[in-house]
From Swiss-Prot:
The lineage of its organism: Eukaryota, Viridiplantae, Streptophyta, Embryophyta, Tracheophyta. GO terms for molecular function: RNA binding; zinc ion binding. This is Pentatricopeptide repeat-containing protein At5g50990. Residues 409-439 are annotated as: Type E(+) motif. Belongs to the PPR family. PCMP-H subfamily. InterPro entries: DYW_dom, E_motif, Pentatricopeptide_rpt, PPR_At4g14850-like_plant, TPR-like_helical_dom_sf. It comes from Arabidopsis thaliana (Mouse-ear cress). PPR repeats lie at residues 128-158, 164-198, 199-229, 230-264, 265-295, 301-331. Residues 440-534 are annotated as: Type DYW motif. Keywords: Repeat. Residues 336-408 are annotated as: Type E motif. GO terms for biological process: RNA modification.
Length: 534
């Protein structure tokens, strides 16, 4: 590997010449200098960064990792990337005793500079398993899940560096976030080949990843094959069943947990309440909510109240859900108000929807869209349009739906009306064919979801090209008949897509597993595991 050497005195001279009588050059505390650097976020702040950097060298703080990283990041924000690179290369040229590569990578990842961390890694000669673990874990923290898996693959190319438990735990987390079953199985296989002994963290991670990738059967198999002496493993299984709408299984696991004398915690009950909410088990949910404090002395937290509000709202008890919010001993958060807003949309209660919006101090695009949909579904077009105008005035944009799936070892992504895929023409041809076939079997689009008071034909056109429909058309195009289909989506699936996919599952006699922001939907023979309750 070629190393680039930069003269230390040259760096010092460069910094010292930038000194002036500014406030940054008068600071002596490294903490204050760090704050100054973090406050520099635009090209107009370049001079301040140079002065702070000069003061850092003058005071002998030049090799402090936290200040180094802050300086590099500040240069990047101020469009001085060449200075950021020079500084990093200089630091990498120092002796190993001075240059702590792992600390630098960790610090860069913490502030979201994964690109710079990767450059540091490329120029570092003294890499070890910790170095790579910091890269993999950092990518996961920065929501770069595919990069995390690439890092694991690159790590395996070194004969003297072997992945350990931390490597695998982070990689499994990446697979879970992606819903990538192919790579989840690959990581699991690597663990077995490496002879890794499972601990509670890895056991729960395996149960969790298979559940989140849509393979609840394998998740169950793993659960019953490992030592279940830690509550986290039980929680992973209960939560997995909850997201798949398998209430009976989740409740059974809780009973087994009690029989094996494993004490539940607050996460256990959150999983149970979520299960009850997703499956419409109102009375059972109320019982578990009371059981928490009555038998186990676990005081309900904000998320438990949120689950109860969600449970009541989904059951159509929207007014009762609002009354629970009003009686809470804890200040309700935005999640709870959004839950009320969502149930107000489902059960067409614009009055409570407006109350929810008023209590969202920083309402997001999805909140306004929900309120707009409430008005649209009740034919109050003028009110719906006012909400959209308010969004436009406030500069709030609707979050775009995105769907993705793994096929052929690659992640394929789609957005509504997408034409960027290499096989776009074939995808749309398959989709149009499916739309016509489902229509001939009696499917009717749910045009109440479309905002504007336009013709029914135009409304239907707006619904036909949602991201999950394009993803489904692609996988039908590429996969063999009869195989299971797995698709992920970043936001809640609309009722039109939900009903249409039910129709497709019956039409093609295929199982379609769809994971949206709320839960898993297993479509089979024209039915969904959520029982139209999500």
């Amino acid at each position: 590997m070629q190393r680039i050497s930069i003269n230390v005195s040259g760096i010092r001279r460069f910094c010292i010449t930038s000194l002036s009588s500014s406030s940054a050059s008068n600071l002596t505390d490294h903490g204050m200098l760090k704050q100054v650097l973090e406050s520099c976020k635009a090209p107009s702040n370049s001079k301040c960064v140079l002065q702070a950097h000069a003061q850092i060298f003058k005071l002998g703080y030049g090799t402090y990792p936290s200040l180094l990283v802050s300086t590099v990041a500040a240069y990047r924000r101020c469009n001085r990337s060449y200075l950021a690179r020079r500084l990093l290369l200089w630091f990498l040229s120092l002796s190993p005793g001075v240059c702590n590569i792992n600390l630098i990578i960790e610090s860069l990842m913490k502030i979201g500079e994964s690109g710079l961390a990767k450059k540091v890694l490329r120029n570092a000669s003294d890499q070890n398993v910790i170095t790579w673990n910091l890269m993999i874990g950092g990518y996961v923290r920065n929501v770069q899940y595919e990069e995390a898996l690439k890092a694991l693959k690159n790590m395996l190319s070194f004969t003297d560096i072997k992945p350990n438990k931390f490597s695998f735990a982070s990689s499994l987390a990446a697979c879970a976030r992606l819903g990538d079953l192919h790579h989840a199985k690959w990581v699991h296989s690597l663990m077995i080949d490496s002879g890794i002994e499972l601990n509670a963290i890895l056991s729960s991670a395996l149960v969790d990843v298979y559940a989140k990738c849509g393979d609840i059967g394998t998740s169950r198999e793993v659960f019953y094959s490992v030592k279940r002496n830690d509550v986290s493993i039980w929680n992973a299984m209960i939560t997995g069943f909850a997201t798949h709408g398998l209430a009976t299984e989740a409740i059974r696991v809780f009973s087994e947990m009690e029989a094996e004398h494993v004490s539940p915690d607050s996460i256990t009950f959150l999983g149970l309440l979520t299960t009850c909410s997703h499956c419409g088990l109102l009375e059972e949910g109320k019982e578990y909510f009371g059981l928490m404090s009555r038998r186990f002395s676990i005081q309900p937290k904000l998320e438990h109240y949120g689950a109860m509000v969600d449970l009541l709202g989904r059951a159509g008890r929207v007014k009762e859900a609002y009354e629970l919010i009003e009686s809470m001993p804890i200040e309700p958060d935005v999640v709870i108000w959004r839950s009320l807003l969502s149930s107000s949309r489902t059960y067409k209660n614009p009055e409570l929807g407006e109350i929810a919006i008023q209590n969202l101090s920083k309402a997001k695009s999805g909140d306004y869209v929900l309120l707009s949909n409430i008005y649209s579904s009740t034919k109050k077009w003028e009110s719906a349009q006012k909400v959209r105008e308010l969004m436009s005035k406030e500069g709030i944009r609707k979050a775009k739906g995105k769907s993705w799936l793994e096929f052929g070892g690659m992640i394929h992504r789609f957005k509504a009306g997408d034409t960027s895929h290499i096989e776009t023409k074939a995808i749309y041809k398959v989709l149009e064919g499916l739309i016509q076939k489902t229509k001939s079997q009696g499917f009717v689009s749910d045009t109440d979801l479309v905002l504007m008071d336009v013709s029914e034909e135009e409304k239907e056109e707006n619904l036909n090209y949602h991201s999950e429909k394009l993803a489904l058309a692609y996988v039908i195009l590429k996969s063999s008949p009869g195989t299971e289909i797995r698709i992920q989506k970043n936001i809640r699936m609309c009722s039109d897509c939900h009903n249409w996919i039910k129709a497709v599952s019956k039409l093609l006699n295929r199982v379609i597993i769809m994971r949206d922001r709320i839960r898993f939907h297993r479509f089979e023979d024209g039915l969904c595991s959520c029982r139209d309750y999500w």
